[in-house]
Amino acid sequence: MRKLLSALILSFSIWSVFSCRQENNVTVKQYPMFWTWLDYRPGMNFDSVCQVMNDIGMDGIMLNAPTPDDYRIAIPIARKHGIEVYAWLWTMNLEHDRDKILAEHPDWFSVNRNGKSLADTTAYVDYYKFLCPALPEVREFIREKIKSYCEVEGLSGIAIDYNRLVDVVLPTTLWPHYGIVQDREYAAWDYGYHPAMLEKFKSRYGYDPREQQDPSADIKWRQFRCDQITEVANMIAGVVHSYGKTMAASPFPTPKMASRMVRQDWGKWNLDIVFPMVYHTFYTEDVSFISDCTVENVRDKNDKTVLYCGMTATDGPEMFECMDAALNSGAQGIAVFTVAGLRSFEVKKRFKAYTDSVRAVRAANGGIIEAVHPHVADTNPFTHKGIMALVEKRMRRIVAEASGKEELPPLALGEYKQTESYDATRCYRVADENSRTVFKVTFYFYGDVLSGWDVVAE
């Protein structure tokens, strides 16, 4: 009885949160509402994965498979379970054909501001082998690859990924893993300096961006590289649409963040549907990041693009907080990375109840879920209660470690005073009267949202 009551309360709360009105005579194309990304490999038990998806209410899958023929095997299995399949394809970063292209076309690879090519150097990880989008032969290679997948019968769409440059700035929670701080753009990670890219820019604007004192501050140069990626995306869209299929993408969290971090101005892409990867655990670690990004995406996406929200799987209550944050802020559906992360019976059961309820709301409102959150993201870090709680927890841990104690002590914080502001970075200083510790607290704003933070003791 208690489980049934919980399901009824969940259904009622969603109806209340999403109650809205739909204008008459508005026709909205219906896409699958709940998705996952998944790697497909020959020999895997794909039927059992599809059964789990069907059981919990997922009806769309972005599938990454090595060859077009693998999709010809997988699609009938997915369809048996009522699941629509998009090919999840890497574009500017090579995947299944990486070694072949490295051997045959080392001149195709992206170059950083220091003149180092990915053909013979590494950026973060070995599999980062990005191509130069300015090269006609690279575009033709991508075009032919996309065509080969579009020819697969029963494939509903193409969802592109890695259609960008190398991360000039990583999400903040990944910095410790690489032993770096990216409070501004640094040359080693600033890619897009292939000779063909530089020549193309110079022929248009009359100068070499490397001549600038700080090339990262050159807005024309930044936007030019974004536009090269946009041209590739829209070339792909033209191919996909010529086959009558849906064009989708999985870009970074918002167009403004993506433009700064990976030169991916995806609000200008000709997408039918977009699944921005709003992975809050990589950024602020607070669910408010999902709300802020989704609000920005409603504003900055292509008007013809249907907005979804991609998020990491959480095998607990936070999964539903994340989906609420996205749907309340204007997303029309959810993509989870990945379904395998939803493991417990209780979470799967609740996920099914959630998907059923949200679909009912969408159907009752003419195919649309309207936003109920404010239309402007909150850029004041001190009003983000969840983020500030995490900041203070980090402070308490620092004090405890310094004193050799396991118990986290209480804080008596004074006033936060801003000490510095540059590029996307704001620095503050605050003292704890109890421990006599002074903390440096830094917030990062890549795009128009609070995208990361850090705390250290001075």
Q: What name fits each language-model region?
A:
Residues 23-47, 251:
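Boundary/entry segment of secreted carbohydrate-active catalytic domains
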Residues 159, 205, 220-260, 305-315:
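Aromatic-lined carbohydrate-recognition surfaces of secreted/lumenal glycan-active proteins
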Residues 168, 246-286:
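Substrate-binding cleft/loops of secretory-pathway carbohydrate-active enzymes
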